[in-house]
Amino acid sequence: FSGYIWPELLAVHPDVKPIERTSMNSWEDDAFVAAVKATGRKKLVISALWTEVCLTFPALMALEAGYEVYVVTDTSGGTSVDAHERSIDRMVQAGAVPVTWQQVLLEYQRDWSRKATYDAVMDLVREHSGAYGMGVDYAYTMVHGAPERKA
């Protein structure tokens, strides 16, 4: 819906075929719902470009269908701050759990001894986590004696 998917996103999941749809509410698309059901999972982590519609509508319907829904509030956006916040309120009142991108990232990492994903997680944290990212740099240089990072 609404054009091509960004190549940067497709590059992260090259084996996933996008589901073409015309509805604003992905949960009203049979192919989308079938793909979700095919995973066998009952927990959904979702975000969308348009909070009031493309996030709220499928979140509410997934909750109604018995899914546990986590909405990533800081990777979604509304047409205004108020519209975004009221939509998040509506989903939370219906049972959705609000989370941030960093909560999701670090919950997936869970343990710093997981070396397969450690470096990529640290790169994301350094680039996008503000003061926490700066703290990571500090710890690496001052505590661990790592070389200074170059821009």
Predicted regions and their residues:
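Active-site alpha/beta core segments
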Residues: 1-57, 122, 127
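Short Asp/Glu-rich motifs
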Residues: 3-5, 81-82, 110-111
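Short, hinge-like loop/turn segments at secondary-structure boundaries
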Residues: 8-14, 36, 64, 86-90, ...
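A contiguous pocket-lining binding segment that forms or flanks enzyme active sites
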Residues: 43-48, 52-101
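Long, charged alpha-helical interface segments
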Residues: 100-105, 109-151
